[in-house]
Amino acid sequence: MKYSIIIPVYNRPEEVNELLQSLTKQTYRDMEVIIVEDGSTVTCESVVRNYAGKLQLRYYTKENSGPGMTRNFGAEHSQGDFLIILDSDCVLPEGFLQAIEDELMRKDCDAWGGPDRAHDGFSSVQKAINYSMTSFLTTGGIRGGKKQMDKKFYPRSFN
């Protein structure tokens, strides 16, 4: 297994549906998807069941402990060579995993990430907030467009 995609979830079944749909459109398929429900009162279990035949999925539930501990839980249950940690509101563009695979074949690295991009359905206010959170003037550094911190860390490419 090349990639373990870990998704911590708290009361977000609609977002998980959109994320899983984007994962079904990936051309690179050597991945497992690990969804960890972090004490949700509104679970995504039925959404996950809808994708059982389309993706290699594992679904876990646990008591609420926050996103960090939930990501760690997913990592402990992963089998992939690389961990990709996504929030439930992410939607991956087609070719995301293939682009990662191509880059890792070209040049080794220890970690990578990607800037946030506003969803087309966001309101003007949501888009303005997104811009302010990812603008070079407000965040600088990696999120602001720095090309490389050192030899083994690459800036956020897209998320």
Region locations from a protein language model:
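N-proximal low-complexity "stem/linker" segments adjacent to membrane-targeting elements
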Residues: 1-25
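Glycine-rich, basic loop-to-helix element that forms the pyrophosphate-binding segment
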Residues: 62-78, 99
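Conserved donor NDP-sugar-binding/catalytic core segment of glycosyltransferases
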Residues: 95-127, 131
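A recurrent flexible, glycine/aromatic-enriched loop bordering the glycosyltransferase active site
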Residues: 118, 141-159
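The conserved acidic donor/metal-binding loop of glycosyltransferases
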Residues: 87-91
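A structural helix-start
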Residues: 9-17, 37, 41, 93-94
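Acidic donor-binding segment of Leloir-type glycosyltransferases
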Residues: 20-61
